[in-house]
Regions:
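Catalytic cores and adjacent flexible loops of soluble metabolic enzymes
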Residues: 1-311
């Protein structure tokens, strides 16, 4: 199974998207030498709504500053349809040789518009484009199949399901996705999962993906990411690569550390965005009070943070 490492992009949430350039270069150089890793996702492209820092607002000059113009064509960038520019001319094309994939994530309510934009993005850029289905655990089996039939005709190279809330247990839940995966596979799409570890099941879920011959998964060093983090790169990497990676971790141990929150366990239990966990922690709520609120959150408020719920 191939790997897209998202340490700088998803891990950016833990450092306010302000990675030191020296570390980012070390990271890029070290992981680029690992054949098991297909792409290194450096951050979000040209977004400003949540941060003014470098790795949330990438452009080609900033990417080249990290890659030092290596021409490896192994950089991925992420855009969130809800927040990104909808002008295709704002995106990199195949005229450069650093970025070779754009990954676009979409909420359920944005999918129709996101698909049309993704088609134009693929046409304009002529590089790989991935369509990432956010909040996948809150789709029913029927919704997944319906969504797959809608998405499959579009010219995406990868389709990803994001376990955004970290509440999937693929030992039991993967069967819910098999119909949709079959639709994508029959259309020649590569299929992968982004696994969060809010309930401690990322490694269990990874093993299920391997058993079922999925094409790709996301990782991050030491699970760096939003909330309680992601599938850990060092746990799934071929052992022959562990020496160099371990040295990179040792040299940057303080930077590469997140602290899982007990509030994440509750949001994961109820399939909620971990932004509620972040707010519950800020308010120093008791777990009992926090859970009483969480169990009443429904519909789109589960996936999209409603600031009116926890004031």
């Amino acid at each position: 199974m191939k790997i897209i490492d998202v340490t700088l992009r998803d891990g950016g949430h833990a450092v306010e998207f302000d990675w030191p350039l020296k570390f980012a270069r070390q990271y890029y150089s070290t992981l680029s030498s690992i054949n098991q890793i297909d792409y290194l996702e450096l951050g979000y492209w040209g977004q400003k709504s949540k941060s003014a820092n470098t790795f949330y607002d990438l452009d080609l000059e900033k990417v080249c500053s990290v890659t030092q113009k290596s021409n490896r064509s192994n950089v991925s960038i992420m855009i969130d349809y809800h927040y990104c520019s909808h002008e295709v001319s704002d995106y990199p094309t195949d005229s450069q040789s650093e970025i070779s994939m754009i990954r676009m994530c979409s909420r359920k309510e944005d999918i129709n518009e996101a698909l049309e934009f993704g088609k134009e993005l693929k046409r304009y850029t002529n590089i790989n484009v991935s369509f990432n289905i956010f909040n996948a655990s809150n789709y029913s089996e029927e919704e997944l199949i319906e969504t797959a039939k809608k998405v499959a005709p579009y010219p995406f190279d990868y389709i990803y399901f994001a376990d955004t809330h970290g509440d999937l247990n693929l030992v039991h839940d993967l069967s819910r996705f098999k119909g949709a995966m079959g639709v994508f596979k029959s259309g020649g799409k590569k299929v992968g999962f982004h696994l969060h570890d809010h309930s401690g099941l990322a490694m269990v879920n990874y093993n299920e993906l391997v058993k079922n011959n999925l094409d790709s998964t996301d990782t991050s060093i030491r699970g760096m990411g939003k909330g309680s983090g992601n599938l850990k790169l060092e746990y799934v990497l071929d052992k022959k690569y562990l020496g160099e990676l371990s040295q990179l971790i040792l040299n940057n141990e303080k930077l590469l550390t997140i602290t899982p929150s007990p509030y994440d366990l509750i949001t994961s239990k109820y399939g909620l965005t971990d932004n509620y966990a972040k707010r519950g922690k800020e308010l120093a709520m008791s777990i009992a009070d926090f859970e009483n609120v969480c169990k009443r959150i429904t519909s789109l408020d589960k996936d999209s943070y409603n600031k009116e719920i926890l004031k």
